[in-house]
Amino acid sequence: MKIVSVGTVAFDAIETPFGKTDKIVGGACTYISLSAAYFNNSPHLISVVGEDFPNETIALFKDRGINTEGLQIKNGEKTFFWSGKYHQDMNTRDTLDTQLNVLESFDPIVPNSYQDCDI
């Protein structure tokens, strides 16, 4: 079954009572696609990143069988960034910073090759 995921491929900075990261790859579309790759022959993603997004991560997507034809890379722009702090229970969090960057003008384009996807 072929699926399409539309959403964020981003950078996150996360603080918990147990540790802190400054800039890691995040975003719903990232983790939906990576998770689906374990059960699906060909997840397809639609998102946008800036020129600061690591080529190694795009290569990882491809290595895992994720179709990245719908991933727009905007030269001269920065990737969406979110920063948050999770509380002791890990169920609640506060957003510390949101920088829309490329997401502000994102116009999702569905490639023709995605037209036969089931979901």
Residue ranges and their predicted role:
Residues 1-4:
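Extreme N-terminal starter segment of soluble prokaryotic enzymes
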Residues 7-9, 28:
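Active-site metal-binding loops of divalent metal-dependent hydrolases
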Residues 12-19, 23, 41-118:
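Conserved N-terminal subdomain of the carbohydrate kinase-like
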Residues 19-34:
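Short catalytic helix/loop segments, enriched in acidic residues and glycine
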Residues 33-42:
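Alpha-helix C-terminal capping segments
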